C-alpha cells in the first residue's frame, strides 16, 4: 500500500476499473486516497464495528484509519449498531446485512459430499471438526468413537507434519487419501472439501476458538448443523448471534468442550440437537437478501 505501487496499479487498470469493492476490514489508506483522487467509486460491505474497533478509537492510528474509511463512497454494515457507531464519527452507511449468508446457502444447496464418505458414515452420528487446531483435536481425543459415533477431522493445516501429529493422537484413524474406511475416525488431508462435508455432520466442532478467533460458522449453520467452539467469538457478530439463538455452544476450555460434546451426544439430547440445527439454518435464512441489496447500489 505504497504511493508508487498503488499509482502503478491504477495506471495499468484505470481504463477498465468501474468501481472498487472491499469486504469487512480490508481497507488500505493509500489505495483509498488514490481511488478518491481518480474519481473511482469505492464500496466496502459486510462491515461490523464495536466501540473497540480500531478506526473508532480516539488515537493517532484510529484517526488515520478513520480518514481512510471516510473515502468510501458507500459503507455497507451488517447491523444497526455498526451504522450508529459510524454515524457518531460522521460517516454515513447503509445497513445491508451479511452477503456471506447468500453464498453459504447457495453452497449448501449445490455441494455434494464424496460418495465414499457418505457410505462410510452410514447411519452413525458424525462429529465433524472443521478447521481444527490442536486444542479441539486434544479434546476430541478424550471421546470414545464407535460404529455409531464417528469422527471426521478436517484440520486447518494439512501439511504432512500436522496430519502425522493428529494421527498420533488417534492411532485408529486413517487419512482420507488412503481410501481405507475400516475405522471410526477419518482425517481429511486434502483441501476444498470442508464445505461439502458439513452436509454429513450431526455436530460441528469449529476450530479457532482457543486461538485468535473462530473460523467460519456460517457454513455449518447453512447446513443446519449445531456447533461447539472455543470461547473466542466476540469479534464475530454471526457467532454471537448464533449462540444467542442456541445454535452455537461455547466451551471455555478443551476439557469443557469434551464434556459439552459428550452431553450433546447423549441419547436423550436428540431433540436439543435438532432444535439447535433448525435454529442455525433459520438464522442464516433470515440473513439472506444482502447481496441483492448491495448490488443495487453498484454502478
Write out the residue ranges for each language-model feature:
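C-terminal alpha-helical cap of glycosyltransferases
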Residues: 286-299
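Active-site and donor-binding regions of nucleotide-sugar-utilizing enzymes
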Residues: 1-111, 128, 132-136, 143, ...
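Conserved catalytic-core segment of nucleotide-activated headgroup transferases in glycan assembly
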Residues: 105-177
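Short, aromatic/basic amphipathic alpha-helical patches
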Residues: 60-62, 88, 163-172, 239-241
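Structural alpha-helical scaffold elements that stabilize or flank donor/cofactor-binding regions
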Residues: 9-13, 68, 120, 197, ...
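Catalytic binding pocket for nucleotide-activated donors in carbohydrate/polymer assembly enzymes
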Residues: 72, 88, 199-267, 273-274, ...
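Conserved sugar-transfer catalytic core signal across GT-A, GT-B, and GT-C glycosyltransferases
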Residues: 31, 136, 193, 213-217, ...
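Acidic donor-binding loop of glycosyltransferase active sites
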Residues: 15-19, 183-212
Amino acid at each position: 500500500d505504497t504511493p508508487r505501487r498503488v499509482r502503478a496499479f491504477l495506471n495499468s487498470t484505470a481504463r477498465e476499473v468501474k468501481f472498487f469493492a472491499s469486504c469487512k476490514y480490508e481497507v488500505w489508506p493509500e489505495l483509498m486516497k488514490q481511488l478518491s483522487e481518480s474519481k473511482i467509486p469505492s464500496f466496502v460491505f459486510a462491515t461490523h464495528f464495536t466501540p473497540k474497533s480500531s478506526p473508532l478509537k480516539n488515537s493517532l492510528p484510529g484517526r488515520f484509519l478513520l480518514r481512510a474509511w471516510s473515502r468510501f463512497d458507500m459503507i455497507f454494515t451488517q447491523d444497526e449498531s455498526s451504522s450508529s457507531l459510524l454515524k457518531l464519527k460522521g460517516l454515513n452507511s447503509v445497513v445491508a446485512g451479511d452477503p456471506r449468508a447468500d453464498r453459504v446457502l447457495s453452497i449448501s444447496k449445490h455441494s455434494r459430499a464424496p460418495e465414499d464418505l457418505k457410505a462410510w458414515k452410514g447411519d452413525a452420528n458424525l462429529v465433524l471438526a472443521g478447521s481444527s487446531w490442536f486444542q479441539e483435536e486434544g479434546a476430541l481425543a478424550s471421546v470414545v468413537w464407535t460404529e455409531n459415533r464417528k469422527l471426521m477431522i478436517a484440520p486447518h493445516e494439512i501439511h504432512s507434519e500436522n496430519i502425522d501429529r493428529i494421527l498420533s493422537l488417534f492411532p485408529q484413524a486413517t487419512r482420507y487419501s488412503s481410501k481405507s474406511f475400516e475405522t471410526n475416525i477419518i482425517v481429511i488431508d486434502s483441501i476444498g472439501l470442508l464445505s461439502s462435508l458439513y452436509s454429513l455432520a450431526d455436530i460441528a466442532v469449529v476450530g479457532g476458538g482457543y486461538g485468535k478467533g473462530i473460523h467460519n460458522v456460517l457454513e455449518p449453520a447453512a447446513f443446519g448443523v449445531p456447533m461447539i467452539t472455543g470461547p473466542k467469538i466476540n469479534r464475530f457478530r454471526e457467532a454471537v448471534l448464533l449462540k444467542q439463538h442456541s445454535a452455537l455452544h461455547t466451551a471455555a476450555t478443551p476439557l469443557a468442550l469434551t464434556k459439552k460434546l459428550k452431553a450433546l451426544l447423549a441419547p436423550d439430547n436428540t431433540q436439543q440437537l435438532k432444535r439447535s440445527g433448525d435454529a442455525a439454518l433459520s438464522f442464516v435464512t433470515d440473513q439472506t437478501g444482502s447481496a441483492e441489496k448491495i448490488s443495487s447500489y453498484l454502478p
